[in-house]
Amino acid sequence: MSKKHNQTGEAAMSESKKTSYLLLSRTDEWYKQLSHAELQKIIADNHAWVGRLIAEGKARPGVALAREGATVSGNNRAVLDGPFAESKEVIGGTLVLDVATMEEAIAIAKACPSLRHNSTIEIRPISDECPLEACAREKAQALATVNA
């Protein structure tokens, strides 16, 4: 959220509230067959797109993710090589948007240059609480209502 300063210098929240959205870029390894020049063009297009969003105050710098990784799952804490052992698709990078609506986040995602190469962009609102915490809060509120 942006802040404005009033005449006394106190920070006041601007009228336009922003929500943060996480963009997850999913892709397979389509790029391995491209020439160096083709790769450089795609990289430049993506950097320009992200740079514009950051300059407009709509995004924060994201992170690129390595292909390698591990997955730990279940009660037995099974460890599998790779972030998505059952899939050839991987999350290649992330970007956090700070925009007013999901519709604006979708419009921004639709402009991602990587989509021309069959990448997928998943858009998720960033929440102040995880689903487990939200469920516990809702159940506590329901119990308080019943016991009131």
What does each model-found stretch correspond to?
Residues 2-148:
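Conserved, structured core segments of small domains
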